[in-house]
């Protein structure tokens, strides 16, 4: 199960569609509150996480996931339009497993 937290509807729908049609099980969330509700029901195998989100930024979500024993080891890939070296270092220093700058190729 892959969870994608992305507020851009076009990106969220394209990525979840592509992952699902590649044989993976992906669910997209527009808002962090939707993501947290789903996390109470089922933990994913991977989280794709935008940084700039409504309600709560991606780095805050990342820190919360890493601080909780039940979610600390879930792989997290930050996906963001913020692509400076500083942004990438901040993401990795806060516990992301990798950082992918938008726009990106789904292949």
Region annotations inferred by a language model:
Residues 50, 80:
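Active-site residues of response regulator receiver
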Residues 54, 84:
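The feature encodes the CheY-like receiver
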Residues 43-45, 70-75:
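His-Asp phosphorelay/catalytic-motif detector in bacterial-type signaling
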């Amino acid at each position: 199960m892959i969870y994608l937290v992305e507020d851009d509807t076009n990106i969220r729908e394209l990525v979840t569609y592509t992952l699902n049609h590649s044989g993976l099980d992906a669910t997209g969330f527009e808002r962090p509150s939707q993501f947290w509700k789903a996390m109470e029901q089922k933990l994913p195998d991977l989280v794709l996480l935008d940084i700039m989100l409504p309600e709560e930024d991606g780095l805050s979500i990342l820190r919360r996931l890493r601080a909780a024993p039940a979610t600390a080891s879930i792989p997290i890939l930050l996906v963001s339009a913020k692509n400076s070296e500083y942004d990438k270092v901040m993401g990795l220093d806060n516990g992301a497993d990798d950082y992918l700058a938008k726009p990106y190729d789904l292949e």
